[in-house]
Each structure stands twice: as C-alpha cells, then as structure tokens.
C-alpha cells in the first residue's frame, strides 16, 4: 500500500483494476481426503486438495484459491493497524486441518465514490478498510468463528460446532500459526460480498460433504 501511494505521489500514471478479497476456511483434512479420494483409498494417499468455483445469482464469482492441504492459516500482516492472512503447508502436509481462501471479485464499479480519494487509489482504500476491520475485531490477532455463527451473524450461537462429538475437538493451534481470537468475522465483508460468500459455501457443501 505504501509503495502504491509513493508511486502515485511521484506522478506515475496509474489506473484502478478489479481485485479479489475473501476469507479463509478450515476443514479437517481427513474429511477432505475422504471426499476427494473415496473411502477405499483416502487413508493411503497423500493429503488431498480441491478447487471450487461458483457463479452467484448476483453475478459475483466465488472460488477457492491457494488451497493448503494439511496446512495452517498464518498472520501475513505488514502494516500496523491492518490485518491480512494467508495459508501455508509444511513439506509433509501433515497438519490436521486443510484451509483455503474463498474469494470474490471486487469490481471497479463497487469502489466507493469518495471525492477525497483519487479514482485510481479507491481499490486500495477498499482493501485497507477491510484489513482495518479485521484488525479491530480480532484485536490484532487472527479472528475466527464457525460457519453457523457467520450465517446467523451472532457470535457464540454455534460455538458448540467446534466440539460436535467426543472425537472432534477444535484447537486453534492445530489450524493457525500466530495469535487467534474467537471474533465476529461476519462483520468484515460488506453485505454484497458476504451474501456471495454464503451462497458459494452452500454450493460447495453440495460438492464436498460438510464444506
């Protein structure tokens, strides 16, 4: 962001472009293996991956990106007061959880018409605002919640989903690297993108059981 601002102030000719934003989702790697490889083979094959896409009724494309088998969600922030995350897998892809970004396109027509921000920098302003929200709700840590909580827009209403059965316990340290906080992730994205995210997740759930 600082680099783009510096180049703009130096007089470099610039123009706005569409970009993608989204959220990272985590699932037990074993469930992904079972869905992708089948019951007969899933225990003997390496950690499975997936690639998912969906075009929403509103015309927004939703797709998985940078899927990390047996990996971790990591804090990739580089600017004070802003939060961005990424995913990674170790060489053995041996982590208990898989994760991937589920992202949506933000078009130039979606950029706010803020007269105080140059037109070519309005996409950067959108990105910074989302990263600022993420930082605030997580108090600088990686915020997380269940999909049920996200759907209802109420933190804590579906927290039991993290501990569904005696053989499933969600421990943040097994899915994340860095500090975490159970927080209202549903407050980050604007409504238009949030609805697209949920529609995409519902579609993906019909293709990978439990997604």
Regions found by a protein language model. Give the residues of each.
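Residues forming the flavin
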Residues: 1-211
């Amino acid at each position: 962001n600082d680099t783009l601002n510096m180049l703009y102030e130096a007089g470099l000719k610039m123009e706005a472009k569409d970009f993608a934003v989204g959220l990272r989702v985590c699932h037990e790697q074993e469930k992904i293996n079972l869905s992708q490889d089948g019951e007969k083979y899933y225990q003997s094959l390496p950690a499975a991956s997936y690639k998912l896409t969906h075009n929403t009724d509103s015309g927004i494309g939703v797709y998985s990106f940078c899927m990390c088998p047996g990996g971790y969600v990591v804090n990739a922030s580089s600017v004070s007061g802003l939060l961005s995350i990424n995913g990674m897998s170790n060489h053995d892809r041996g982590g208990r959880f898989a994760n991937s970004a589920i992202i949506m396109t933000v078009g130039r027509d979606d950029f706010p018409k803020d007269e105080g921000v140059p037109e070519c920098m309005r996409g950067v302003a959108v990105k910074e605002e989302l990263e600022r929200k993420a930082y605030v709700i997580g108090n600088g840590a990686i915020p997380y919640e269940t999909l049920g909580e996200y759907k209802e827009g109420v933190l804590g209403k579906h927290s039991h989903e993290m501990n569904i059965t005696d053989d499933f316990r969600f421990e943040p340290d097994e899915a994340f690297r860095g500090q975490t906080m159970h927080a209202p992730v549903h407050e980050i994205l604007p409504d238009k993108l949030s609805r697209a995210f949920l529609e995409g997740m519902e579609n993906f759930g019909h293709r990978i059981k439990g997604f």
